[in-house]
Amino acid sequence: MKTFLQNIPKVELHLHIEGSLEPKMMFELAKRNNITLKYKSEDEIKKAYDFSNLQDFLDIYYQGANVLQTKQDFYDLTFAYMKKCKEQNVVHTEIFFDPQTHTARNIPLKDVIEGIWQALQKAKEEFGISSFLIACILRHLSEEEGLKTLDELCLYKDKIKAIGLDSSELNNPPFKFKNLFQKAKEEGFLLVMHAGEEGSSEYIKQALELGVNRIDHGVRCQEDLELVKQLAKSQIPLTICPLSNIKLKVFQNMQEHNILKLLKQNLCVCVNSDDPAYFGGYILENFIALDETFKLSKDEVKKLCINAVNASFLNINEKEKLVKQIKAYK
């Protein structure tokens, strides 16, 4: 089964590029940019990755992002992730980045976007992997700050496909950003939002009301049977991240995870890695972890992979081509 999981064509839709910063690269970039880390070794960093909730993780995540200073840093970070995609047979990926995490440190937005973008283009040429870029607004900050960031992002419509919402979910509901997402839509961006990870199913409903194309996480939809039915009917995708959910105690263990239950209820759920450097695995490791717990059938794996294609922002022809490849895969 591992070989089957390794080689099946995969699409990843929930990946924070800052969350793919491996400890080794964190040290390399800290050295390159003359930054002192509070950790003495890679092992010490890994020990710190014992989180009890989302906030614990975010505190370390934002600290790690400090080593990202130059366009070259963003290029190297992104290209390292794209190499991983090549190894794990990810054929298309839609990557999140957090503009405000970097502009708050006086890093020019242009450097962030161009560094990431150039690495994505290089991966397209070298590995044939297609990709889109999604800019996430930080929900623990104000809508006003988010709107200023959105204005800047409008200069890069040729490079940014969608606007997202991430960071601390509790007490930062989607409606806090109602005006921002309305403006993003008017500007022609697609919309995605993290909702229903630590926040309740109510947050998912708010996100749907704001017209999102996709929900990131969404596992707490199960608290509301009507919502589950609505999601099955509308086929609004949920980009689910199993290892992340265990690491951040959204579920206590993999047996409790509801992704297969939601799949059986005909929701458009797919498998993703979220912040792989912090949560102990990329997309393949997430599939393997699910298989170890639930003994996935090949049909279930194919369905999860096809859902990811259908949930993507690829055009209809590209989707059909990929779905055919997955269906034909043995």
Curated annotation (Swiss-Prot):
GO terms (BP aspect): adenine catabolic process; hypoxanthine salvage; nucleotide metabolic process
Any GO CC annotation of this UniProt entry: cytosol
GO MF, any single term: adenine deaminase activity
Gene3D superfamilies named among the record's database cross-references: Metal-dependent hydrolases
Entry-linked SUPFAM superfamilies: Metallo-dependent hydrolases (SSF51556)
NCBIfam families in the cross-refs: aden_deam, PRK09358.1-6
Assigned protein family: Belongs to the metallo-dependent hydrolases superfamily. Adenosine and AMP deaminases family. Adenine deaminase type 2 subfamily.
Protein's name according to its UniProt entry: Adenine deaminase
